[in-house]
Amino acid sequence: KKKNAAFEFCEADYFLAYRDDKIVGRVAAIINNQANKKWECKNVRFGWIDFIDDPEVSSALIKTVEEWGKERGMTHIAGPLGFTDFDAEGMLIEGFDQLSTMGTIYNYPYYPIHMEKLGFEKDADWVEYKIYIPDAITDKHKRISELIQRKYNLKIKKYTSGRKIAKDYGQKIFELMNEAYSPLYGYSPLTQRQIDQYVKMYLPILDLRMVTLITDANDELVCVGISMPSLAEALQKSNGRLLPLGWFYLLKALFMK
């Protein structure tokens, strides 16, 4: 809890389901007080939920979260959700044969069936798209880009140093995210401590060739584009472990393409 800045405004407990001394399920119960205040609700969140294909297990996990929330004055339950939008969210309902990105949740097809039987209804849709990038940018798109840059006096900025981009724009990047993400489902703004953590966690490992900043006439940051290689295949090869060779697969996916 000391390491996770989200505990400045969140509280949580974690539960395991056992049968015959074997773990058959898990779930986190979370209250994001900041999000509840912003969205004027009293939601307890369930997150990081996993269970075997047994309704008794899934029901026990959800009921445990419900009771935990009721004891703390909550009136509704929602999930899967993490502490913030930077945690994995949602439940896969189609595309089970597709390889997802690292930041999304994969679950077996029986998961949403269990949720429906427990009385849950869909509250929001998240859609993941695959966009194919052309080998070369067309002249038309180049002309449009140049026209917009001239019209609004925009400047494109690229960096080659993670420390330099963190120093110059680390704070501003996450302030812009707070503003842009504000209307999104369940979003709660990042605190200063969270911003400091994310700047240290993410900016040093980004391939800066795939990071683009756009500033206006006053040198204010108005847009940021961050792309990252998928680590899904690397995590499969490493079996989710850094040793003995997991670190190599991850570094190769990040920087060697």
Model-derived features: positions:
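Acyl-donor binding region in acyl/amide transferases
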Residues: 37-119, 124, 238-257
